[in-house]
Amino acid sequence: MSANTTTESFDCVVVGGGPAGTTAAQRLAQEGRSVLLLDKPGKIKPCGGAIPPKAINDFNIPDSQLVCKVAGARVISPKGRNVDMPIDDGFVGMVDRKDFDPWLRNRAALMGASYREGAYQGLERGTDGVPVLSYRPMGPEDGRNAPEVKVRAHMVIGA
C-alpha cells in the first residue's frame, strides 16, 4: 500500500470505546495529539459497572453518571451460604454501561478526539512503514455494505 492512498492521518487510532479506550483517547487529545476513537456501535460487554471512589475522583466522573452507591456486597453460594463483604472507603459507585460508555466517548470527543462508529478490519504497514488501519463505517446500517476506510496512524491502541 502506498502512503498516499489514504486521506487521513492521525497520531493515534484507539480501537475500542469502553473506559480504557476513551480514557486513552481523551488523554492523548488533551496533550494535543490527533486521535481517532473507533468503536463498534451497540456492543456493551458484560460488566457489573462498579467504580471505586478513587477512580471516580481520579477520572472526574460526576455523580450524574452514578446509578447508585453501594456500601457492601453479598455473595450467595449454590448451597445457600452467604458471605457479606463490606466495601472499603464507604461505597462503590455503580454505572450503567449502556449510558456510561456513550458519555465517556462524548467526553473524549469534547476534548478533541474524533469519534467514529465502525468495525475494525485490519492493520498493515504502508510503504513508508507507518501503520494503516482499515475499518468499515457503521451507523443506521450494519456496515457490511459500507466501503472500507483506511487511515494512517503513527500509533494504534487496541482497547
Where do the protein language model's features map onto the residues?
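N-terminal beta-loop-helix "entrance" segment that forms/cooperates
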Residues: C47-P53
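Beta1/beta-strand and adjacent pyrophosphate-binding region of the FAD-binding site
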Residues: N4-G18
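A conserved beta-strand/loop capping segment in the N-terminal third of enzymes
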Residues: K54-L110, E117-G118, G122-R125
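Short, mixed charged/polar active-site loops
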Residues: T7, R81-D84, G143-K150
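Predominantly flavin-linked oxidoreductase catalytic cores and closely associated redox partners
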Residues: G17, R27, E31, R107-A159
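Glycine-rich FAD pyrophosphate-binding loop
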Residues: V13, G17, Q26-C47
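N-terminal Rossmann-fold NAD(P) dinucleotide-binding loop
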Residues: G21
